[in-house]
Curated annotation (Swiss-Prot):
Subcellular location(s) of the protein: Endoplasmic reticulum lumen; Sarcoplasmic reticulum lumen; Melanosome
Signal peptide: 1-21
Modification type Phosphoserine: residues: S64, S172, S306, S403, S447
GO process annotations (BP): ERAD pathway; protein folding
Ranges of biased composition (kind: Basic and acidic residues): 792-804
Gene Ontology MF terms: ATP binding; ATP hydrolysis activity; ATP-dependent protein folding chaperone; unfolded protein binding
Renumbered ranges of motif SRT pseudosubstrate motif: 42-44
The protein, known as: Endoplasmin
Source organism of this protein record: Canis lupus familiaris (Dog)
Length: 804
């Protein structure tokens, strides 16, 4: 008996020692545990344990192997731009940390898009793993969050390049945009996705990030970083992923909320429910399952059954094992985004909130769209599409206008994402429109370049433009004028210039300021409705500002007679109107050019002709003598009421506003426009016969055509009219000299009187030297005074001694 007791005690001690040894091998909860096996399987039955083996984990490395792995890994320093980027992201988005999951899922979706596109032309692309999924797993015990995709994966070089460096130009642009957004008080969380730096948002919640990736053209590698530096090494376990990428986050202490299943599920539904690939979360649920009974329970139940059914035939079939119902926690992958692609559903079945959520998901914007349209196009090509107008213009909308691709239309063929890199899915002027296009009629297994030349794309583009213009037209007037026109008005004007086939439709969307209202903008339809009887032209005046346009001498009589004038205040406005010959049967008239005429009675006509005859000497003198080289002709004006004169361009010449624009453009490109046909056109000099200056000039010319004062006055009037008409003076010094001469005459000062010369003065000593000399003199005087006092004291002392 004693021997048995001793033997039992030894067994207990051996068992305890074995447990302690296992505990010592186990690794503390550090990043190294990320490379160990998950313990989730211990919570499930055998069948679930098998499913658990599919869970996202980095298998099979013990503590010594992990240490050896880290010692052999190649260390890298982050590029300086990446360090700046990460610091800016962490500092600016620390209050919105949850967006890290959105960015990681978005990157995973991009990787899946790439491998699916490759598989269209390479049948072996999916051989490593035919699944196209995103899987997320929380590991509370180890404080780890895993995000795995079966996308294209990354080679070793791509891990170093994509996760350790970034284009310098892209960094600068991103930093500038972040700064601008912060200064404007706008959200910065959308920028990181737009600039492709969303991966670094992982450091908002993680102390360390581990990326395991397998590309079809390389072995599996592990990338690891603590945000200060990173390392890369070949995975000693070999190919455990098949293909794709696992991102493992070692979460910060304050980020433990992101290990809660409900938190992760809510974030996936909030940000990523419209991702085009299934997203799974490793989740638990309680199920009622059948379990075999213990032998005693089964025997007891069998006895009860035999009491109830005593007469049972002996040839009864073989007895089935007894089971009981038990509630059990089961772990499995739960699908988070089981929603059909929104554009594939009938528009009547889609709620407004769903459109808004989809827009935010695919465009990475935080604001709701201003407008959207969901339609199915049929005919030569069938496709489904949803198009959106954003609330605000994308940053840098007109940077290198026309030379940069538009990323805002995503093309799908049979629900397979093809590209967002087409240059002409939309015309340049609609480069702000965002949306998706999905067609079953386009070929799948061709290159992007071949697809871009496909004739059906031109048909799709044509229908997209028509639907976009319909969508814009339906935006409510108040919202259109206050929001859309401020953000995208220039795009519509460029459309009038560039899109000949849709020019009439676009013209109805134009808005301008006018003399009808001091601040509100007006459409051309509204202008035509307000036109005066017998008015056959739409009058417009171009200027650098509304104030300049409405104070121009060209609009004086028009406004006095009650005609409405459109004010063109943007550089592109005059180009736009020039490209639009008419609207609703009414031609446009630039009031700064020839051709402005008013309906006049017979009496008015006779009066005008009499005035023209009266001023004929002055007109001829100006044309043939005083302004011979400066003007084409001089005429009596019908458009001036207050100003003495104006300089009017010919129908084919440049107005003052257009000439300024052309000179500015020429200055930027280094061209000389002085020889340009339009720039070389001479202008017409119009005079106001009722103005006192003009009347007095007529009198003086009749008296003496060679009067130099009158000649100077004519030139000064011409140059003043040049400025008031919006043109630039070629010689401003000569203009200033003439003004000075006219002022001398008006003040009865001799025109040849010279300016008095300033008398020459002897150079004075500087204040600093004088001050220093004064200070030195004072010091010397003080020293001298001190010496005298000392001598007198000595003499006194000697005299006193003599007396004693």
């Amino acid at each position: 008996m004693r021997a048995l007791w001793v033997l039992g005690l030894c067994c207990v001690l051996l068992t305890f020692g074995s447990v302690r040894a296992d505990d010592e091998v186990d690794v503390d909860g550090t990043v190294e545990e990320d490379l160990g096996k998950s313990r989730e399987g211990s919570r499930t039955d055998d069948e679930v344990v098998q499913r658990e083996e599919e869970a996202i984990q980095l298998d099979g490395l013990n503590a010594s192997q992990i240490r050896e792995l880290r010692e052999k890994s190649e260390k890298f320093a982050f590029q300086a731009e990446v360090n700046r980027m990460m610091k800016l992201i962490i500092n600016s988005l620390y209050k919105n940390k949850e967006i890290f999951l959105r960015e990681l899922i978005s990157n995973a979706s991009d990787a899946l898009d790439k491998i699916r596109l490759i598989s269209l032309t390479d049948e072996n692309a999916l051989a490593g793993n035919e699944e196209l999924t995103v899987k997320i797993k929380c590991d509370k015990e180890k404080n780890l969050l895993h995000v795995t995709d079966t996308g294209v994966g990354m080679t070793r070089e791509e891990l170093v390049k994509n996760l350790g460096t970034i284009a310098k130009s892209g960094t600068s642009e991103f930093l500038n945009k972040m700064t601008e957004a912060q200064e404007d008080g706008q959200s910065t969380s959308e920028l990181i996705g737009q600039f492709g730096v969303g991966f670094y948002s992982a450091f908002l919640v993680a102390d360390k990030v581990i990326v395991t990736s397998k590309h079809n053209n390389d072995t599996q590698h592990i990338w690891e970083s603590d945000s200060n530096e990173f390392s890369v090494i070949a995975d000693p376990r070999g190919n455990t992923l098949g293909r794709g990428t696992t991102i493992t986050l070692v979460l910060k202490e304050e980020a433990s909320d992101y290990l809660e299943l409900d938190t992760i599920k809510n974030l996936v539904k909030k940000y990523s429910q419209f991702i085009n690939f299934p997203i799974y979360v490793w989740s638990s649920k309680t199920e009622t399952v059948e379990e075999p009974m213990e032998e005693e329970e089964a025997a007891k139940e069998e006895k009860e059954d035999s009491d109830d059914e005593a007469a049972v035939e002996e040839e009864e079939e073989e007895k089935k094992p007894k089971t009981k119902k038990v509630e059990k926690t089961v772990w499995d992958w739960e699908l988070m985004n089981d929603i059909k692609p929104i554009w594939q559903r009938p528009s009547k079945e889609v709620e407004d909130d769903e459109y808004k959520a989809f827009y935010k998901s695919f465009s990475k914007e935080s604001d709701d769209p201003m407008a959207y349209i969901h339609f199915t196009a049929e005919g030569e090509v069938t496709f489904k599409s949803i198009l959106f107008v954003p609330t605000s213009a994308p940053r840098g909308l007109f940077d290198e206008y026309g030379s940069k691709k538009s990323d805002y239309i995503k093309l799908y063929v049979r629900r397979v994402f093809i590209t967002d890199d087409f240059h002409d899915m939309m015309p340049k002027y609609l480069n702000f429109v965002k949306g998706v296009v999905d067609s079953d009629d386009l070929p799948l297994n061709v290159s992007r370049e071949t697809l871009q030349q496909h004739k059906l794309l031109k048909v799709i583009r044509k229908k997209l433009v028509r639907k976009t213009l319909d969508m814009i037209k339906k935006i409510a007037d108040e919202k259109y004028n206050d929001t859309f026109w401020k953000e995208f008005g220039t795009n519509i004007k460029l459309g009038v210039i560039e899109d000949h086939s849709n020019r009439t439709r676009l013209a109805k969307l134009l808005r301008f300021q006018s003399s009808h209202h001091p601040s509100d903008i007006t459409s051309l339809d509204q202008y035509v409705e307000r036109m005066k009887e017998k008015q056959d032209k739409i009058y417009f005046m171009a200027g650098s500002s509304r104030k300049e346009a409405e104070s121009s001498p060209f609009v004086e009589r028009l406004l006095k007679k009650g005609y409405e004038v459109i004010y063109l205040t943007e550089p592109v406005d005059e180009y736009c109107i020039q490209a639009l010959p008419e609207f609703d049967g009414k031609r446009f008239q630039n009031v700064a050019k020839e051709g402005v005429k008013f309906d006049e009675s017979e009496k008015t006509k006779e009066s005008r002709e009499a005035i023209e005859k009266e001023f004929e000497p002055l007109l001829n003198w100006m044309k043939d003598k005083a302004l011979k080289d400066k003007i084409e002709k001089a005429v009596v004006s019908q458009r001036l009421t207050e100003s003495p004169c104006a300089l009017v361009a010919s129908q084919y010449g440049w107005s003052g506003n257009m000439e300024r624009i052309m000179k500015a453009q020429a200055y930027q490109t280094g061209k000389d426009i002085s020889t340009n046909y339009y720039a070389s056109q001479k202008k017409t000099f119009e005079i106001n016969p009722r103005h006192p200056l003009i009347k007095d000039m007529l009198r003086r010319v009749k008296e003496d055509e060679d009067d130099k004062t009158v000649s100077d006055l004519a030139v000064v009037l011409f140059e003043t009219a040049t400025l008031r008409s919006g043109y630039l003076l070629p010689d401003t010094k000569a203009y200033g000299d003439r003004i000075e001469r006219m002022l001398r005459l008006s003040l009865n000062i001799d025109p040849d009187a010279k300016v008095e010369e300033e008398p020459e003065e002897e150079p004075e000593e500087t204040t600093e030297d004088t001050t220093e000399d004064t200070e030195q003199d004072d010091e010397e005087e003080m020293d001298a005074g001190t010496d005298d006092e000392e001598q007198e004291t000595v003499k006194k002392s000697t005299a006193e001694k003599d007396e004693l």
